Amino acid sequence: MATGGAAADLEDVQTVDLMSELLRRLKCSQKPDKRLIFIGPPGSGKGTQSPVVKDEYCLCHLSTGDMLRAAVASKTPLGVKAKEAMEKGELVSDDLVVGIIDEAMNKPKCQKGFILDGFPRTVTQAEKLDEMLKRRGTEIDKVLNFAIDDAILEERITGRWIHPSSGRSYHTKFAPPKTPGVDDITGEPLIQRKDDNADVLKSRLAAFHSQTQPVIDYYAKKAVLTNIQAEKAPQEVTSEVKKALS
């Protein structure tokens, strides 16, 4: 991490947060840089593992949806262009998304690297991402593919139930409420998200596989892909992820 750049970045940190930011940088200074991509279908556990890896290696988590919303809200030049596209009902171009990722990488919390989640979804996007990273003199270090059988995913997702006001979640098989269909704390009814039914899930998985397999093949040819057996218990998956990144 360049010292001059790091010092300049501190100008953007509010005084009240300055000490915690300096302590974070001290802790992170000995960590190796890592630029990672997490690939996996809905329910594969990426969201569970991302915070663990982020904290362990002092990385930032880059979700394309979050970055687009932040760029639009802060009215950056790229954010303005993205907003124009969205207001016209158009897809935000690959170049624009890569540009927003490029901007996000300049943030102090991304100086040791990042976890990219939700991008790239196509080989063209992967190529554009590689081109941008090459201009920065860097590259993707590792792509983790959270591989899991569709039948296991269906069991995981279709059994999920939520208590709307608190966000508490249950599972009919793995973490059932004391009384079926009722929140343990309030006694209020539980609901199931619209996306958590078998038909919607099968459609999403079919789209994921057809769209993402070429991306998996792309990174496999570059010898940076590791398959993670995501059907295991979360702690076992964490161990496998750490082993892959060591």
From Swiss-Prot:
Query: Region LID: start and end of each range?
Result: 159-196
What does it catalyze? AMP + ATP = 2 ADP
Q: What is its main location?
A: cytoplasm
**Keyword Manganese carried by entry:** no
Q: What is its EC number?
A: 2.7.4.3
Residues where AMP binds = T64, R69, E90, L91, V92, G118, F119, P120, R121, Q125, R193, R204
Signal peptide residue numbers: none
Chain positions found as N-acetylalanine: A2
**Record's InterPro entries?**
Adenyl_kin_sub, Adenylat/UMP-CMP_kin, Adenylat_kinase_CS, Adenylate_kinase_lid-dom, P-loop_NTPase
Q: Which HAMAP family match?
A: Adenylate_kinase_Adk
Family assignment?
Belongs to the adenylate kinase family.
What is the recorded function of this protein according to its Swiss-Prot or TrEMBL entry? Catalyzes the reversible transfer of the terminal phosphate group between ATP and AMP. Plays an important role in cellular energy homeostasis and in adenine nucleotide metabolism.
Name of protein:
Adenylate kinase 4
Q: Which organism is it from?
A: Arabidopsis thaliana
List the lineage, top down. Eukaryota, Viridiplantae, Streptophyta, Embryophyta, Tracheophyta
This protein's gene is called ADK1
